[in-house]
Design a protein with these regions (language model features):
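Feature marks short, surface-exposed loop/turn motifs that line or immediately flank catalytic pockets
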Residues: 26-29, 171, 210
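Short, internal active-site loops enriched in acidic
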Residues: 26-28, 86, 206
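Conserved small/polar residues in nucleotide/adenosyl-binding loops
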Residues: 204-210
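Conserved core of the PLP fold type I
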Residues: 51-197, 201
Length: 214
């Protein structure tokens, strides 16, 4: 299909004035009701870790929450930030910090071109965020067990404008596939093959134990 044909088909879709809700993962009303008792769990006990939970929180989050995260991640709690429930907001904060402050190099705003590897199919809101920041997106196809790492490694070796990869290793959105251990190991080593300020943005939700397991 030519570019002209694609643009023609795209215009046909626009002309339909569709208003579709493509949001995924929204809980049903029945599921939302399950969390209602949590509203009363504090029972007027608002002090924790020496902080009044009704007031503005600490920038890095409560120490107790960070220590719990450290246990789950197997790292020092000082390397954990507990901040809100929106991973997309956190990703935006990280990318903006890299743009204006940088890490292991210059601030990204000083580079003529910044690129990110994007496993596809992928999460549309990740792509929208990168597009908004003016970041060039390079597609890396998913293969059923994660992205094509041969291709990803080849790209980062030859193109130093590539400063990161954004991915969802567990139940990837929208395909649902989970990256294999082999792919995860190569993904972890990717920064060593890339530019010194390469950043891996990994959306991974941890499987917490159930009450029965506890």
């Amino acid at each position: 299909m030519t570019k002209k044909e694609i643009e023609k088909n795209y215009k046909k879709l626009l002309d339909q004035n569709l208003n579709l809700d493509l949001t995924r993962g929204q809980p049903s009303k029945e599921q939302l009701k399950l969390s209602e008792p949590m509203d009363q769990i504090l029972k007027n006990k608002f002090n924790f870790d020496g902080e009044d939970l009704r007031n503005y929180g600490l920038i890095k989050g409560l120490d107790s929450t960070r220590k719990l995260g450290a246990i789950l991640l197997g790292i020092n709690y000082k390397n954990v930030i507990a901040n809100g429930t929106s991973s997309l907001n956190l990703t935006s904060m990280v990318i903006q910090a890299l743009f204006f402050k940088g890490i292991n190099g210059e601030a990204w705003k000083h580079y003529k071109k910044i690129s990110f590897l994007c496993p596809v199919p992928g999460y549309d809101r990740h792509f929208s965020l990168l597009e908004m920041m003016g970041i060039n997106m390079i597609n890396v196809p998913l293969r059923g067990d994660g992205p094509d790492m041969d291709y990803a490694e080849k790209l980062v070796k030859k193109d130093k404008s590539i400063k990161g990869i954004i991915c969802v290793p567990k139940h990837s959105n929208p395909t649902g596939e989970t990256y294999s251990l082999k792919v995860l190991e190569r993904l972890a080593r990717l920064p060593k093959k890339a530019s010194k300020d390469f950043m891996t943005v990994s959306y991974t939700h941890l499987t917490l134990p159930t009450n029965r397991e506890v």
